[in-house]
Amino acid sequence: MNNKPKVCIVGNMITLPYSPDHSGIIQGLQILKDKEKISDYFIADISQHQTYGERAIIETIVNGKPDLVIHGMTDSLSQEWPRFVKERLPNVIQVMSMWDYRPDYMNYDGFWSKWIESGRYLDLITLSNKNQLKWWAKDFGAKTMYWPHGCVVKSIEYDSQYEFDTVFVGSRNESTPYNERVKLIDAIDRLTPVKWVNEGGGDSNSARIGIWKDLGKIYGSAKTTLDISHFWDADGYASGRYFYTSGLGGCAIAKRFPGCEELFPEGTKIYFDTPEEAMDKIKYYLNHNDEREKIKIKGKEWANKYHSYEVRFLELFNWFNL
């Protein structure tokens, strides 16, 4: 490999470009290309597999001749793409990046026994939580690294139609165990009103795409933003929302989880444990405009400095001494 690797990302960055994670990933790679940290990058979009057949995405990866493949979706494990790639490109470095999280007892929705078959073809697995690093390493027989979500870097936007007192953007999933978040938000809403956007959820429907396009305006314009992941039990784990609520200029009222202040210290976000505490903090910042703006600015500055995808990719490259 030369000193400037060529990188392939496997994921929906073409199909769903407006996701803050996806736009942040492309932004980070383009910055690194401009700075000559990488020679080039390309995307193997999941739609190629869905549209053109089982092996189409493999051909895209192989024909691109990357030095490093980052599998960003679990389809790679379910479809055994790491094996097919390794057969054709024996010297390529392959990374499986798991930005999602499920508690151990869920066995990753029953896919675990299939996924671990790809372990022998992976050089590294990155996880967005610290609790499961040893478990994944043992069952996959691969090295693991903590590597959470990041955020896209862009200016704070404003649109008066989104100037809600308190907003939450995310799905309303009533199934167990995801309904714990629903219960928490409903409890807060009974104490102080919460505007819930995208209750129906989904990634590819037109309504969701419209929300993604306007997400910067939503977080930048709302006075306060509820920042709650589906799970808050794992050390270091938060969904992508945790990084781009602040990265897009929101005054984030965040559910506390283990390790949260290592990622965003108090003062860049406002943390709570109970619905009553969330209510108190929401009402305080609704009534203190200057303090609210300070949180927005500090949170964004912190996100841009420590949690951009340029930073994330440099962390990964450093792990491999690239």
Predicted regions and their residues:
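Short amphipathic alpha-helices within nucleic acid-binding modules
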Residues: 281
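Charged, glycine-enriched surface loops/patches
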Residues: 84-97
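Nucleotide-sugar donor-binding catalytic core of glycosyltransferases
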Residues: 2-64, 72-83, 110-267, 271, ...
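A short, histidine- and acid-enriched strand-loop-helix "catalytic/donor-clamping" loop
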Residues: 95-108
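A charged, aromatic-enriched C-terminal amphipathic alpha-helix characteristic of glycosyltransferases
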Residues: 286-320
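Short, acidic/turn-prone active-site loops that include or flank metal/cofactor-
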Residues: 99-101, 149-152, 275
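Conserved acidic donor-binding segment of nucleotide-sugar-dependent glycosyltransferases
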Residues: 268-275, 284-289
